[in-house]
Swiss-Prot record:
Keywords: DNA-binding, Metal-binding, Repressor, Transcription, Transcription regulation, Zinc. Zn(2+) 2 binds at H117, E120. This is Transcriptional repressor SmtB. The zinc ions are bound between subunits, so that residues from both subunits contribute to metal binding. Transcriptional repressor of the expression of the smtA gene. Binds two zinc ions per dimer. The complex of DNA and SmtB is dissociated by zinc ions. PROSITE patterns: HTH_ARSR_1, HTH_ARSR_2. It comes from Synechococcus elongatus (strain ATCC 33912 / PCC 7942 / FACHB-805). Changing C61S: Does not abolish zinc binding or metal-induced derepression. GO terms for molecular function: DNA binding; DNA-binding transcription factor activity; metal ion binding. Transmembrane segments: none annotated. Residues 28-122 form the HTH arsR-type domain. Zn(2+) 1 binds at D104, H106. CDD domains: HTH_ARSR.
Length: 122
């Protein structure tokens, strides 16, 4: 017996009740979902992703980051502020220079996993 194939716009209505299954399922809390949405919204900017790609390799100052992605230091500082607010990057001051690095290994893993996924889908 073959499974039916759905055409665009078709839906399937489940037969029977699924109360037992549904009672065991639990979605994340609304406030957690909101935090995740804000997190991914910050990552939705191409220049921020380019900055993360550079910081995944090395600690860099604002001037180096600006030159590497071809935007002003002011624009880089603005993007870094958004990343810093979500604790994706941290910084240290050395004299007049401020050096940025990714906050922790979770950010590197998230970035690398997303890249791997995109390459597998090609």
């Amino acid at each position: 017996m073959t499974k039916p194939v759905l055409q665009d716009g078709e839906t399937v209505v489940c037969q029977g009740t699924h109360a037992a299954i549904a009672s065991e399922l639990q979605a994340i809390a609304p406030e957690v979902a909101q935090s995740l949405a804000e997190f991914f919204a910050v990552l939705a900017d191409p220049n921020r992703l380019r900055l993360l790609s550079l910081l995944a390799r090395s600690e860099l100052c604002v001037g180096d980051l600006a030159q590497a992605i071809g935007v002003s230091e002011s624009a880089v500082s603005h993007q870094l502020r958004s990343l810093r607010n979500l604790r994706l990057v941290s910084y240290r001051k050395q004299g007049r220079h401020v050096y940025y690095q990714l906050q922790d290994h979770h950010i590197v893993a998230l970035y690398q996993n997303a890249l791997d996924h995109l390459q597998e889908c090609r």
